[in-house]
Regions:
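Conserved, mostly hydrophobic/aromatic
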Residues: 55, 120, 169, 187, ...
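Substrate-binding cleft and catalytic face of glycoside hydrolase catalytic domains
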Residues: 80-276, 287
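Bacterial N-terminal signal peptides
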Residues: 8-20
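Glycoside hydrolase catalytic-domain groove-lining segments
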Residues: 262-315, 339-348, 385, 390
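Acidic, Ser/Thr/Pro-rich beta/coil linker or hinge segments at domain junctions
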Residues: 434-487
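Aromatic/acidic polysaccharide-binding cleft in carbohydrate-active enzymes
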Residues: 304-422
Length: 504
């Protein structure tokens, strides 16, 4: 929650932000691009829900039992507005939920399921339940996926037994936690069935069969539970999903899909257009919003249950200060177009490619091995302090927000492509119409402030840091640049600044 400040802004004040060159006598990086942005505090505002910090992905279900996972989760909970966690493989054999006796009769075991979900709830977080992958005893094929833990992307050998598994799973959760609690969860059927996480043929038709059985089972457990899909990769299948559920009268309480900044235009839009990483997510979100709006279910909630700047391991992307302006820009682009967006992932307690060998390798997580916050984590912490109302939505490189106490929080960013450094911008914030003198607090994230990756490289990029080095990395990770009682600052590229303005 945003800390309340004493006093409030005087009604009818104007806020003017000018981006201009600073005096040549100041010790600063080379002068950057001069730009002027005028912000009017009297402009109308609209609600600005923090849709980007309510759901986060993580490594597969069984990893949530580890102390390191739960430590990272507590770190997230203390710094953001995280409400839900989504992970793969709650039905994987290592969770032990399903087996059959010699006569083929199902046996269910919810021991690890209970420990997994208890661990989330004990830390103030609810499950976003992705129902995957297929238990070996129920799978039509035992050919595994290439992931290190070898999940089975197979259809069930018996769809009736699949439906019974989902029903008994959901019914157990209702019995254990109560329907008042579980009705606030989300149940999502499978993961990315349009690519290699689903081997049914034809893929879409067999997925819809899987979905229909699961959705009926969820509603049979209790009609108040929420179920949706298709959890597709590459923003795919949304119109088909809505059309199918309408025709088949299959329950559908939300639609979900995924996008990554380095997805290809041909996969998202069916074109050869070269779309920059900074724009891909926003473009895909707009596409799906338009599809839902023009469908038979125009008011369906849209949940992006995975997104990130990269689906590959790119150290100068997900581990770097690049993520600050990338995230802020995507918040700007996607505002008003989605119910929630789930960043993949909050932690590098993650083993899809195997056991982590080094803390920085381009992992998806906001928190590196050893509970070391990355620059992207710091960006989420800063953006958490934005207000709950927004004005001036036409601005390209800033978000102007107003808080309930009347203060302002402004995110300003300077984007540069991954692995590059752009021109530094000089920024001056001016406030007019105040009774008295405004006070400023400015926080800046860039390659030299708040980037544990930079500190790790300065150590010589140790593959296995010592305990002392990990402690040093944790200290450095939180060392963003902080400025008080000044309205001027230099913003490197890549860089993200949060400017907080309040009465003196």
């Amino acid at each position: 929650m945003t800390r309340s400040w004493v006093g409030s802004l005087i009604a009818g004040t104007c806020l003017l932000l000018e981006v201009a060159s600073l005096a040549s006598s100041q010790q600063a990086p080379a002068p950057g691009v001069a730009e002027e942005i005028v912000l009017d505090a009297q402009a109308s505002t609209r609600p600005f829900p923090h849709y980007w910090e309510q759901v986060f992905g993580s490594g597969r279900a069984i990893l949530s039992l580890r102390d390191s996972y739960r430590r990272d989760l507590r770190t997230m909970k203390a710094a953001t507005d995280i409400h839900y966690v989504r992970f793969h493989a709650i039905f994987d054999d290592e969770v032990g939920v399903y087996s059959e006796d010699a006569q083929g009769r199902p046996t269910y075991n919810w021991s690890y399921v209970d420990q997994i979900y208890d661990g989330l709830l004990d830390n103030g977080v609810r499950p976003f339940v992705e129902m995957s992958f297929m238990p070996r005893a129920l799978a039509a094929s035992d050919k595994p996926h290439a992931f290190w833990y070898h999940p089975l992307p197979s259809p069930p050998a018996n769809y009736g037994k699949w439906e019974d598994l989902v029903y008994n799973f959901a019914r157990h959760l209702v019995d254990r936690y109560g329907v008042t609690e579980v009705s606030q969860w989300y149940f999502e059927v499978w993961n990315e069935p349009n690519i290699d996480f689903w081997t049914g043929q034809p893929a879409q038709a067999t997925y819809f069969e899987l979905y229909d059985h699961a959705a009926r089972a969820i509603k049979r457990a209790d009609p108040r539970l929420r179920v949706g899909g298709p959890a597709s990769a590459q923003a795919a299948w949304i119109p088909d999903m809505i059309a199918h559920s309408t025709q088949a009268k299959a329950p559908l309480d939300f639609v979900s899909t995924h996008v990554y900044g380095n997805d290809l235009s041909k996969d998202i839009f069916g074109t050869d257009e070269n779309i920059d990483r900074s724009e891909m997510v926003g473009r895909a979100v707009q596409k799906v919003a338009n599809q839902v709006k023009s469908s038979a279910r125009p008011d369906l909630p849209i949940i992006w249950s995975e997104y990130n700047a990269s689906y590959k391991n790119e150290i100068d992307v997900t581990d770097a200060a690049f993520m600050g302006p990338w995230l802020a820009n995507n918040i700007r682009l996607c505002d008003g177009l989605t119910t929630a967006m789930s960043y993949w992932t909050f932690s590098d307690v993650f083993e899809e490619q195997g056991v982590i060998k080094t803390p920085f390798y381009g992992g998806y997580g906001l928190i590196a091995e050893g509970n070391v916050p990355k620059a992207a984590f710091n960006a989420f912490v800063m953006l958490h302090r934005l207000g709950d109302r927004r004005s001036q939505p036409d601005l390209r490189n800033s978000l102007v927000t107003k808080r309930s106490d009347g203060s302002f929080a402004i995110a300003i960013w300077n984007y540069a492509a991954e692995g590059t450094a752009g021109a530094t911008r000089s920024v001056q914030v001016k406030v007019t119409g105040w009774q008295g003198t405004p006070r400023y607090h400015i926080e800046i994230l860039d390659n030299d402030h708040g980037s544990a990756l930079t500190a790790w490289r300065a150590m010589g990029s140790p593959e296995s840091p010592t305990r002392e080095q990990y402690e040093q990395l944790r200290r450095t990770a939180s060392a963003t640049q902080k400025l008080d009682d000044t309205s001027s600052f230099m913003l490197p590229a890549p860089g993200l600044a949060l400017v907080e303005v309040r009465p003196h």
